[in-house]
Amino acid sequence: MTRLLHAFRRGRWTPSLDTAPLPGRAGDRLALVPEIVAAADRRRWDGLAPGLPPAPDRRRELLLDALDLFEHGTLDVGGLGPQSGAEFRDALWESAGIPGPLAERWCGMLRTTLEARPEPSPDRALALVSLPGNTFTCLETVLEQVERSAAVWVRPSRREPLSAARLVAALLAAGWPPERVSLYPTAQPVLRGLIRLTDRHVVYGGSALAAAVRTPAGLTLHGPGRACALVPAGMATAAAADWLLPLIAADSGRFCSNVRTVLTAGPAEPLARALAAALDTIDPRTTDSTWPLTAFREPGAAERATRSVAERMRPGDRLLTRRPPVVVTGGDTYATPHLVLTGDQPPGAPEHPLLGHEVPFPFAAVARATAPAAEALAARSLFVFRPWSAAAVRRDPR
């Protein structure tokens, strides 16, 4: 039986005649909110907000309760009915290919990030958070805006809306006022309209979205991270490979902070071969892997993602990982980790199309680079990793 995941607006779960299919084998669908409906909701909010009771004072305590419910509770998620924590993880696997160990890890990261962040001063803004589909850890921004704003509109990814819907249900169950949160699944063109309709906006997306969305006041755009790692001359090959492996493979390569580019001051091939051998040990058929991989649920998506690497390779570049680019096991489709050693173009040339290329699986390109070339690429990266130090944020994503 096909189910419809509802929107949440005007204080209640709401179906829609405008729907889109959810990825996965269940055949479920997602209710979409047209821009004209969102515009009417903004007008309603402007008239309603002055007369609402104040938002809860102890927001941090409420958010921590909501995270407990998000992770473990049985919640009424609109259109899907009561959903336990275990059923949520099963649904993530079936629809988005997110394995249980990653879901557990990401839930823990949400709590850690919330507890570490200073409590903001609340204001009267209507905030928008437009989420990506690669990881639900970006729900930390929803929590941040709930703690800060008068109300929050959440626009989930159509590829993975389940986590956003469950967080809205958890907020409601923890006592957050229903008029102060909304879930607006929309078609992509409606995003611009949602930005116009709200006061503060946090938008996640890749390079195409970053180019398409204008930058009005109040917009924070989280685009490509272009994360890179700089390996100094003299660092032992085995030590460098051990250091780099988790930077590339953790979280199935889905974070904007996962390293995609490795620039080494020493010979590149020994390091690239050692790293490729380590990546080849990541087997999607192994359920207890240290580095679990996500499965691809959209037909052809894994092939498109891996092809985007092959199409950017230049003469002289070599793919050193040996597994097939895409494997199917138990009916599940995976993109296997990729490691490319760039050829004899200018060392570490920042214009090489593979340097900084982001895909939703573990991938990195290794190049030898002079110090000036490495620093030139690092200046274009949001995350720069050096041995024995934390990631450095090199530029403001705004």
What are these regions (language model features)?
Residues 173-177, 199-200, 209-348:
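ALDH superfamily catalytic-core signature
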Residues 162-163, 210-211, 269-271, 390-396:
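Short, charged/polar "capping" segments at the starts of alpha-helices
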Residues 25-29, 194-196, 223-225, 255-258, ...:
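Short glycine-enriched loop/turn motifs at secondary-structure junctions
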Residues 112-249:
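Rossmann-like NAD(P) dinucleotide-binding subdomain of oxidoreductase/dehydrogenase enzymes
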